């Protein structure tokens, strides 16, 4: 049994933005540290720069809010976690966070979420949708401002 850290990062698209660059950088950093690094995404401009020898890339519809695709992603992510013996799922967005949450429960994998921005919550339904980002084993706030936002709005 291998004790090597194996991290699956899940992000809707790998285009150019703070969350995306963070995902890209962490994936390559983990591989340099002799950990196994995986990314699940629907695609994006940064995918062509992923070092495929160091980071395993899965193209899946994790960007979708369609309930059928969210359910499909639960099964896809669960299979990835089980097949590759992933230790940690790290999700950086609300839409895929729902799939990751249930995949982590099914597989008993640790779940980390990164809260990169403030989310509107004009209704209690929207606030509930956003709250998935706090239902993990570890929540990372992207800044002190985001930490304050989380503390004040999601007690």
Where are these regions (language model features)?
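Membrane-interface segments of envelope glycosyltransferases acting on lipid-linked substrates or membrane lipids
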Residues: 1-155
């Amino acid at each position: 049994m291998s004790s090597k850290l194996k991290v699956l990062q899940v992000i809707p698209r790998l285009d150019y933005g703070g969350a995306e660059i963070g995902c890209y950088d962490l994936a390559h950093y983990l591989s340099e540290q002799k950990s196994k690094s995986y990314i699940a995404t629907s695609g994006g401009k940064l995918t062509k720069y992923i070092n495929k020898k160091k980071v395993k890339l899965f193209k899946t519809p994790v960007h979708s809010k369609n309930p059928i695709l969210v359910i499909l992603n639960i099964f896809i992510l669960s299979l990835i976690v089980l097949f590759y013996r992933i230790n940690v799922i790290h999700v950086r967005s609300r839409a895929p966070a729902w799939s990751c949450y249930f995949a982590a429960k099914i597989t008993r994998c640790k779940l980390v979420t990164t809260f990169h921005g403030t989310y509107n919550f004009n209704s209690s339904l929207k606030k509930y949708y956003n709250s998935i980002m706090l239902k993990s084993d570890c929540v990372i706030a992207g800044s002190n401002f985001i930490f304050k936002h989380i503390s004040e709005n999601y007690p």
